[in-house]
Each structure stands twice: as C-alpha cells, then as structure tokens.
C-alpha cells in the first residue's frame, strides 16, 4: 500500500506549535530541491517556480538541486538549465543514483566548482534524440532541423561547462556513454566526488 509523501513537523518562526508539512515542502524551505523523476513540463515548471521564488526570498543564499533522473524531455530540461543560469544564487548540483541524458545536462549546469556526485552515482550523456523520441509518442513530430539545433545547443553547453574540446563532446554524444562518479569528475561534468562514510570531499 502506498504511504504517500512523508510528513514532518515544522515550526514557523515566532510560533509555539509545529505543523505537519510534507517532507519536500520542509526541505524546500531549506533551499533543497529534488529532481527524482523523468524531466517533463510539470516537474520543470515546479522547479523553475521554486528557484525563482527562493531567489526572490533571498538572492544571496545558495540553492541545492539533488538529481536522480533517467532523463526526459529536452525543452523542459533546457528551461530548467536556463533558469539555473538566470537566478542570482549559486546552484549546487548533486548527483545521487543516476543522472542520465537531461539529468546529466542539469548536473553539468550547476555552479562550476559546486557540482558533486555521490561515490556510487552514475552519469550518462548522449544526443537528445532518443529521449525526444520516447517523449513524443505521436504527440508531435520534431523536425530534423530543430533536432539538429537542439543537439548543437546541448553540445555547446557541455563544451563550455566541462572544458572539453568540441570533438570530444561530439564523439561522446554519438552513443550512450556511462561514467562512474570519478570518471564524471575527470570528464568535467562534476567538480567533486563525495567520500563514502565521511563528510569530506575530494
């Protein structure tokens, strides 16, 4: 039987009694955001709204985006990425589990020097076509020219944010390339790898 979203107590400043709120609501108040599903328009709009709201609330405190995602739709993913670059606070990205396709695109989009992977996390990059075909299911047909532009956009972001040459990124995106956390660090997708059973970073 599904248990639903867990609830935790939260006390507003100046109030004596705590109220029960869902755990994600509580974590959002601490500026912790979660992408734990495929990227689609709904989760994209939710994350964008949270980033903008929390930036208005305090534009000096960093935000933290935890990612465990198999990928998803390209355009909603790019919308999240652009918002990450637009809002004033630095956004830390943390890969736990898997950051594949659009998940890895958002991972690399975190503030440079503030992108982290857990030690057993996996990262996968590839060209945007496969996730688009999956998302399509007859709803729309993506023109080849538009797909090429999207691929160029995604490739350019990886080049800019990893420091790898264009030919390396283009070659990697020809197929599914899976990486360990250490390999993702060497590839420039993350800057830090968490050390197991320790609060230290390498």
Swiss-Prot record:
The entry's keywords: Chloroplast, Hydrolase, Plastid, Protease, Serine protease
Active site, UniProt feature: 101, 126
Annotated EC: 3.4.21.92
Subcellular location field: Plastid, Chloroplast stroma
Subunit structure: Component of the chloroplastic Clp protease core complex.
InterPro entries: ClpP, ClpP/crotonase-like_dom_sf, ClpP/TepA, ClpP_His_AS, ClpP_Ser_AS
Cysteine pairs bridged by disulfides in the record: none
MF-aspect GO terms: ATP-dependent peptidase activity; ATPase binding; serine-type endopeptidase activity
Superkingdom, taxonomy of origin: Eukaryota
GO CC, any one term: endopeptidase Clp complex
Biological process annotations from GO: protein quality control for misfolded or incompletely synthesized proteins
Annotated family: Belongs to the peptidase S14 family.
Catalytically driven reaction(s): Hydrolysis of proteins to small peptides in the presence of ATP and magnesium. alpha-casein is the usual test substrate. In the absence of ATP, only oligopeptides shorter than five residues are hydrolyzed (such as succinyl-Leu-Tyr-|-NHMec, and Leu-Tyr-Leu-|-Tyr-Trp, in which cleavage of the -Tyr-|-Leu- and -Tyr-|-Trp bonds also occurs)
Location (main, coarse): plastid
Organism: Buxus microphylla (Littleleaf boxwood)
Protein's job: Cleaves peptides in various proteins in a process that requires ATP hydrolysis. Has a chymotrypsin-like activity. Plays a major role in the degradation of misfolded proteins.
Pfam families in the record: CLP_protease (PF00574)
Name of this chain's protein: ATP-dependent Clp protease proteolytic subunit
């Amino acid at each position: 039987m599904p248990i639903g979203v867990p609830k935790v107590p939260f006390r507003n400043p100046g109030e004596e009694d705590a109220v029960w709120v869902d755990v994600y609501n509580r974590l959002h108040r601490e500026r912790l955001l979660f992408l734990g599903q495929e990227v689609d328009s709904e989760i994209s709009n939710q994350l964008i709204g949270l980033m903008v709201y929390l930036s208005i609330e305090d534009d000096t405190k960093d935000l933290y985006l935890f990612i465990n995602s198999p990928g998803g739709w390209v355009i909603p993913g790019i919308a999240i990425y652009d918002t990450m670059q637009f809002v004033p606070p630095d956004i830390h990205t943390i890969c736990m589990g898997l950051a594949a396709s659009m998940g890895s695109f958002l991972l690399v989009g975190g503030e440079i020097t503030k992108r982290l992977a857990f030690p057993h996390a996996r990262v996968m990059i590839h060209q945007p076509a496969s996730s688009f075909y999956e998302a399509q299911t007859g709803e729309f047909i993506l023109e080849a020219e538009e797909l090429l532009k999207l691929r160029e956009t995604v490739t350019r972001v990886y080049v800019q944010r990893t420091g790898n040459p264009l030919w390396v990124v283009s070659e990697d995106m020809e197929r599914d390339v899976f990486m360990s956390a250490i390999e993702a660090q060497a590839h420039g997708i993350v800057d830090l790898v968490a050390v197991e059973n320790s609060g230290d970073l390498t």
